[in-house]
Each structure stands twice: as structure tokens, then as C-alpha cells.
């Protein structure tokens, strides 16, 4: 028995350590909700700390990385924002094409996904309303409808995952503010590919085109944003017009 005791103790310690490494999504979601409460009152550093706690509980929690990216953006920590948002996107891409063992596992994943989207919808609704938040809310509601449709069909055991447009949009903005216009352009285009009605992505792409001297593309991007119902800042239109006159 004495010989067995160290073995049993070692096994217990190993089991406890293993348990600590298993992603804990429910606890991470609680930390994430608390982080967004700090975001509402612009307590960016506290929010970032809460997002990091959520990530430590579940390193696969995409939305916590998105929140951390947004918090770092607000603090003008663009390198850190890019890292968090890139990780968020890579987690979404890693899910694409994954196949479930059975239909029950697929349905459980989709129900959990809807629950997380509902969390995100509530968080966006609680933030100050703007064109940006309205567009993100529309995207989230569309994602929810897609997941609900998949649950009702019930026979698809593959994950149809793409990076949400609002993630690519935020990453593009982080790149833009870091002076990386080529990377910003790529991410704005990715946002538009994911959601053609992402008006802010069209508008931001127009700014990139303006900054890089592609005025006809800038005008097209402005028109695309307006078709999507996005209100373009008058100064952007004026800047494009004046630059076009100067080059005539």
C-alpha cells in the first residue's frame, strides 16, 4: 500500500493538471461578459485584463480574442490589437471544414454557437448605438439565422465557418492605424467577401484607395457603401473630388 501511495498521488496531481488545461468555455463566457461591461464605460485596461482571463480559461474562445483586439485598439496598442484579431480569425478558419463524429455532436455545437451569438447580440445592443454597432448587430443576427437553419436541417456534420465580417473589419482598421495599408486593404476586402452589405468596410476601403491614389476605385467603394445603406462622411467625398481635380 505504501508503494502504491506515491503512484496514486502522482496520478491525482496529473489528473488535476490535465483538468486545468481543458478549455472551460462557460467560465470564459462569464469573464467575457464582465469584460464587455468594462468596455461600455471605456475602462479599456480592465476590459483587456478580463478578456485575457477569458482566454486563459479557454484559449479557443474566438470572441474573447476579438474583444481583446477591440480593447487594445481603444488604447492605441495597434500591434497588440493586430495579434489578438489575427488569432481570432485563425480560430474561425481552423473550425472550417471540421467534421463531427455524429449528428448529435453537430447539433450540440450549433446550439452552443447560437448561445454565444446571443451573448454577442446582447453585448452589442448594450453598447452606445452607432452605424458600426448597427452593422455588427445585423451581421450577428444573420449568423444566428444561418446556425438556426443548420439545426433545422440537422443532417450536415461539417462546420461551415468563415471569419465574420466584423472581425476582418476590425483587423483591417488595426492594420490601417499601424500604417500597413496593404494588409488593411486585404482585410477590408475579406470583410466584404464575407458580407457584401458591410458598408463600413466599403467606406474604409475607399479611404485606402484614396491614400494610395486609386481615385476611381475610391469612388466605386463609396458608391458600394451607400448602396449598402452606410452614411459616408462628407469629407471623404470631398477629399476624393479634390484629389481627382488636382490630378486632372
Regions found by a protein language model. Name each.
Residues 33, 67, 101-102, 170, ...:
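Canonical tetratricopeptide repeat
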Residues 117-165, 217-248:
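Terminal, low-structured helical/coil segments at or just beyond the last alpha-helical repeat
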Amino acid at each position: 500500500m505504501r508503494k502504491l501511495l506515491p503512484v496514486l498521488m502522482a496520478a491525482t496531481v496529473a489528473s488535476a493538471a490535465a483538468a486545468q488545461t481543458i478549455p472551460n468555455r462557460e467560465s470564459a463566457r462569464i469573464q467575457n461578459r464582465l469584460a464587455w461591461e468594462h468596455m461600455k464605460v471605456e475602462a479599456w485596461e480592465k476590459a483587456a485584463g478580463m478578456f485575457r482571463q477569458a482566454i486563459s480559461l479557454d484559449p479557443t474562445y474566438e470572441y474573447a480574442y476579438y474583444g481583446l483586439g477591440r480593447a487594445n485598439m481603444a488604447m492605441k496598442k495597434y500591434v497588440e490589437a493586430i495579434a489578438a484579431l489575427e488569432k481570432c480569425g485563425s480560430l474561425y478558419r481552423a473550425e472550417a471544414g471540421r467534421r463531427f463524429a455524429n449528428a448529435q455532436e453537430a447539433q450540440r455545437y450549433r446550439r452552443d454557437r447560437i448561445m454565444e451569438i446571443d451573448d454577442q447580440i446582447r453585448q452589442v445592443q448594450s453598447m452606445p448605438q452607432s452605424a458600426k454597432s448597427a452593422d455588427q448587430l445585423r451581421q450577428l443576427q444573420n449568423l444566428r439565422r444561418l446556425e438556426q437553419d443548420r439545426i433545422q436541417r440537422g443532417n450536415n456534420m461539417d462546420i461551415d465557418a468563415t471569419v465574420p465580417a466584423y472581425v476582418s473589419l476590425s483587423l483591417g482598421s488595426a492594420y490601417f492605424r499601424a500604417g500597413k495599408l496593404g494588409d488593411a486593404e486585404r482585410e477590408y476586402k475579406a470583410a466584404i467577401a464575407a458580407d457584401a452589405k458591410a458598408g463600413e468596410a466599403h467606406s474604409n476601403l475607399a479611404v485606402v484607395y484614396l491614400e494610395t491614389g486609386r481615385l476611381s476605385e475610391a469612388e466605386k467603394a463609396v458608391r458600394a457603401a451607400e448602396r449598402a445603406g452606410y452614411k459616408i462622411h462628407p469629407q471623404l467625398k470631398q477629399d476624393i473630388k479634390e484629389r481627382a481635380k488636382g490630378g486632372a
